[in-house]
Amino acid sequence: MTEFQDPFLKSSEPVKFNEKYVDSSVRPGDIGIVDQWAVTPVSDPCVGNLSTPVNSGYFTKAFLNNLPFYRGGLSPNFRGLEVGAAFGYLLYGPYAMTGPLRNTDYALTAGLLGTIGAVHILTALLVLYNAPGKAPNIQPSDCTINNPPADLFTRSGWADFTSGFWLGGCGGAVFAWLLCGTLHLDTIMPIVRGVWAAG
């Protein structure tokens, strides 16, 4: 048994631990696995930005730094084009398959129009973010994003991003509409529509 003196115990008897629960290879001065995975502040501890195993891990950093918003070497317009194309393409499915006209012949066209409407609303929100007061906030580099794009966080950069987002969103929705309207999907579309059928 290993003895341990607890200063908060009222009795002077040391606490005894079973040997199988004590790791004798770790000494108090050693840097163990706990210290390697400890949460530490990035720069100023008063800001509240912490470096954790999740946000400073290799996979998280590689994933976030390869998103179009943070990837290096892209113009703000092309960033917006990529992000908008993904939004338009991914929003088309829910609007076409779960919309109010899902059981009619106009489901695909209604999904296209609903998606383009949603892209217009999101574009208006991006315009409003750039309009009032000061310029968009410039994100400082931290433990996750090493080099945030400085050209994106200016008024002209954000306007270019917004115009690219609108064009990419409408283009992504039209591309998804064209894919769903091909003859190859005629056998699959009734099955997909039947999943969300309302009786």
From Swiss-Prot:
It comes from the Bacteria. Belongs to the PsaL family. It holds the Pfam family PsaL. It is found in: Cellular thylakoid membrane. It is a multi-pass membrane protein. GO terms for biological process: photosynthesis. HAMAP family: PSI_PsaL. Coiled coil: none annotated. The keyword Membrane applies. InterPro entries: PSI_PsaL, PSI_PsaL_sf, PSI_suXI. One of its GO terms (cellular component) is photosystem I reaction center. Its main location: membrane. The keyword Membrane applies. The chain crosses the membrane at residues 81-101, 108-128, 165-185. This is Photosystem I reaction center subunit XI. Keywords: Membrane, Photosynthesis, Photosystem I, Thylakoid, Transmembrane, Transmembrane helix.
